[in-house]
Amino acid sequence: MRLRKSGISKGFLHPLGYSSNVLGYLVLVNLLASCVMAGIIWFVQHVHYPLLAQTPPDSAVGVAVEHQRRTSRVVALPMAVEGFSTLALLVDRPNGVWWIWPWAGAFLLAIALGSTVFLSVPLHGRMATNPDAQVGARLVTTNWPRTIAWSMRVVVGVIMAVQMGNFG
Protein backbone atom coordinates (compact mmCIF):
# COMPACT_ATOMS: atom_id res chain seq x y z
CA MET A 1 0.00 0.00 0.00
CA ARG A 2 1.27 3.46 -0.76
CA LEU A 3 -0.02 6.87 0.16
CA ARG A 4 0.06 9.51 -2.52
CA LYS A 5 0.72 13.14 -1.69
CA SER A 6 -2.54 14.11 -3.46
CA GLY A 7 -0.87 17.06 -5.15
CA ILE A 8 -0.25 18.96 -1.92
CA SER A 9 3.01 20.85 -1.53
CA LYS A 10 5.32 19.41 1.09
CA GLY A 11 4.55 20.64 4.58
CA PHE A 12 0.97 21.75 3.86
CA LEU A 13 -1.33 21.15 6.79
CA HIS A 14 -5.08 20.74 6.53
CA PRO A 15 -7.52 22.68 8.79
CA LEU A 16 -7.20 20.16 11.64
CA GLY A 17 -3.45 20.11 11.23
CA TYR A 18 -3.34 16.76 9.42
CA SER A 19 -0.82 16.17 6.66
CA SER A 20 -1.96 14.47 3.48
CA ASN A 21 -0.35 11.21 4.67
CA VAL A 22 -2.28 11.34 7.95
CA LEU A 23 -5.50 11.93 6.02
CA GLY A 24 -4.68 8.94 3.83
CA TYR A 25 -4.31 6.80 6.92
CA LEU A 26 -7.51 8.30 8.34
CA VAL A 27 -9.39 7.16 5.23
CA LEU A 28 -7.95 3.66 5.67
CA VAL A 29 -8.80 3.57 9.39
CA ASN A 30 -12.35 4.65 8.57
CA LEU A 31 -12.57 1.95 5.89
CA LEU A 32 -11.20 -0.69 8.26
CA ALA A 33 -13.73 0.23 10.98
CA SER A 34 -16.53 0.09 8.40
CA CYS A 35 -15.33 -3.33 7.21
CA VAL A 36 -15.29 -4.63 10.78
CA MET A 37 -18.81 -3.34 11.43
CA ALA A 38 -20.10 -4.68 8.10
CA GLY A 39 -18.68 -8.10 8.92
CA ILE A 40 -20.20 -8.07 12.38
CA ILE A 41 -23.60 -6.95 11.15
CA TRP A 42 -23.73 -9.61 8.42
CA PHE A 43 -22.90 -12.25 11.02
CA VAL A 44 -25.62 -10.86 13.27
CA GLN A 45 -28.12 -10.74 10.38
CA HIS A 46 -27.58 -14.28 9.15
CA VAL A 47 -26.49 -16.19 12.25
CA HIS A 48 -27.09 -14.44 15.54
CA TYR A 49 -30.51 -12.81 15.13
CA PRO A 50 -32.10 -15.91 13.55
CA LEU A 51 -30.86 -17.89 16.56
CA LEU A 52 -32.28 -15.25 18.91
CA ALA A 53 -35.58 -15.60 17.07
CA GLN A 54 -35.59 -19.30 18.01
CA THR A 55 -34.76 -18.71 21.68
CA PRO A 56 -37.54 -20.05 23.91
CA PRO A 57 -39.29 -17.29 25.90
CA ASP A 58 -38.33 -18.88 29.23
CA SER A 59 -34.60 -18.39 28.49
CA ALA A 60 -34.87 -15.25 26.34
CA VAL A 61 -34.27 -12.81 29.20
CA GLY A 62 -30.91 -14.32 30.12
CA VAL A 63 -29.87 -14.64 26.50
CA ALA A 64 -30.86 -11.02 25.75
CA VAL A 65 -28.95 -9.61 28.73
CA GLU A 66 -25.85 -11.63 27.86
CA HIS A 67 -26.17 -10.66 24.19
CA GLN A 68 -26.20 -6.96 25.09
CA ARG A 69 -23.19 -7.31 27.40
CA ARG A 70 -21.07 -9.27 24.96
CA THR A 71 -22.04 -7.33 21.86
CA SER A 72 -21.17 -4.02 23.53
CA ARG A 73 -17.64 -5.25 24.16
CA VAL A 74 -17.22 -6.31 20.52
CA VAL A 75 -18.64 -3.22 18.79
CA ALA A 76 -17.61 -0.38 21.12
CA LEU A 77 -14.14 0.22 19.70
CA PRO A 78 -14.90 -0.11 15.97
CA MET A 79 -18.02 2.06 16.35
CA ALA A 80 -16.04 4.74 18.20
CA VAL A 81 -13.23 4.67 15.65
CA GLU A 82 -15.74 4.80 12.81
CA GLY A 83 -17.64 7.69 14.37
CA PHE A 84 -14.60 9.85 15.14
CA SER A 85 -12.90 9.15 11.81
CA THR A 86 -16.13 9.95 9.94
CA LEU A 87 -16.42 13.30 11.75
CA ALA A 88 -12.76 14.07 11.05
CA LEU A 89 -13.24 13.36 7.34
CA LEU A 90 -16.21 15.74 7.27
CA VAL A 91 -14.20 18.51 8.90
CA ASP A 92 -11.03 17.92 6.92
CA ARG A 93 -11.76 16.24 3.59
CA PRO A 94 -8.61 14.88 1.98
CA ASN A 95 -7.48 16.38 -1.31
CA GLY A 96 -8.50 14.18 -4.20
CA VAL A 97 -11.62 12.91 -2.44
CA TRP A 98 -14.81 14.23 -3.97
CA TRP A 99 -16.82 16.16 -1.35
CA ILE A 100 -19.88 13.90 -1.63
CA TRP A 101 -18.14 10.76 -0.31
CA PRO A 102 -17.44 11.82 3.30
CA TRP A 103 -21.01 13.13 3.48
CA ALA A 104 -22.41 9.93 1.98
CA GLY A 105 -20.44 7.94 4.55
CA ALA A 106 -21.77 10.12 7.36
CA PHE A 107 -25.34 9.78 6.08
CA LEU A 108 -25.00 5.98 5.93
CA LEU A 109 -23.51 5.94 9.43
CA ALA A 110 -26.47 8.01 10.64
CA ILE A 111 -28.82 5.40 9.14
CA ALA A 112 -26.91 2.56 10.81
CA LEU A 113 -26.75 4.28 14.20
CA GLY A 114 -30.32 5.57 13.97
CA SER A 115 -31.56 2.07 13.20
CA THR A 116 -29.56 0.79 16.14
CA VAL A 117 -30.93 3.36 18.58
CA PHE A 118 -34.53 3.51 17.37
CA LEU A 119 -35.14 -0.07 16.20
CA SER A 120 -32.67 -2.59 17.61
CA VAL A 121 -32.08 -1.25 21.13
CA PRO A 122 -35.81 -1.05 21.99
CA LEU A 123 -36.34 -4.59 20.67
CA HIS A 124 -33.41 -5.88 22.72
CA GLY A 125 -34.85 -4.11 25.74
CA ARG A 126 -38.19 -5.75 25.13
CA MET A 127 -36.54 -9.14 24.76
CA ALA A 128 -34.74 -8.61 28.08
CA THR A 129 -37.89 -7.63 29.98
CA ASN A 130 -40.94 -9.06 28.23
CA PRO A 131 -39.89 -11.57 25.56
CA ASP A 132 -42.24 -13.07 23.01
CA ALA A 133 -41.79 -14.99 19.77
CA GLN A 134 -42.24 -11.88 17.62
CA VAL A 135 -39.29 -9.92 19.04
CA GLY A 136 -36.60 -12.15 17.54
CA ALA A 137 -38.30 -12.15 14.15
CA ARG A 138 -38.58 -8.35 14.24
CA LEU A 139 -34.87 -8.08 15.08
CA VAL A 140 -34.05 -9.92 11.85
CA THR A 141 -36.38 -7.72 9.78
CA THR A 142 -35.44 -4.37 11.33
CA ASN A 143 -31.71 -5.14 11.11
CA TRP A 144 -31.68 -4.82 7.31
CA PRO A 145 -31.23 -1.00 7.27
CA ARG A 146 -28.08 -1.40 9.41
CA THR A 147 -26.81 -4.26 7.26
CA ILE A 148 -27.27 -2.30 4.04
CA ALA A 149 -25.90 0.96 5.49
CA TRP A 150 -22.71 -0.61 6.87
CA SER A 151 -22.20 -2.55 3.63
CA MET A 152 -22.55 0.66 1.61
CA ARG A 153 -20.10 2.42 3.95
CA VAL A 154 -17.49 -0.11 2.85
CA VAL A 155 -18.13 0.84 -0.78
CA VAL A 156 -17.84 4.56 0.08
CA GLY A 157 -14.63 3.90 2.02
CA VAL A 158 -13.07 2.00 -0.89
CA ILE A 159 -13.99 4.85 -3.26
CA MET A 160 -12.32 7.40 -0.95
CA ALA A 161 -9.22 5.21 -0.58
CA VAL A 162 -8.95 4.84 -4.36
CA GLN A 163 -9.39 8.59 -4.83
CA MET A 164 -6.60 9.19 -2.30
CA GLY A 165 -4.37 6.83 -4.26
CA ASN A 166 -4.15 4.28 -1.44
CA PHE A 167 -4.74 1.41 -3.87
CA GLY A 168 -2.88 1.16 -7.12
Give residue ranges: language-model regions.
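Transmembrane helix-loop-helix
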Residues: 88-110
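Juxtamembrane boundary at the C-terminal end of a transmembrane helix
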Residues: 159-168
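Basic polycationic patches enriched in arginine
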Residues: 2-4
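Core segments of transmembrane alpha-helices
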Residues: 75-89, 146-156
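Interfacial loop at the N-terminal end of multi-pass membrane proteins
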Residues: 23-81, 125-138
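Mid-bilayer segments of alpha-helical transmembrane spans in multi-pass integral membrane proteins
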Residues: 110-118
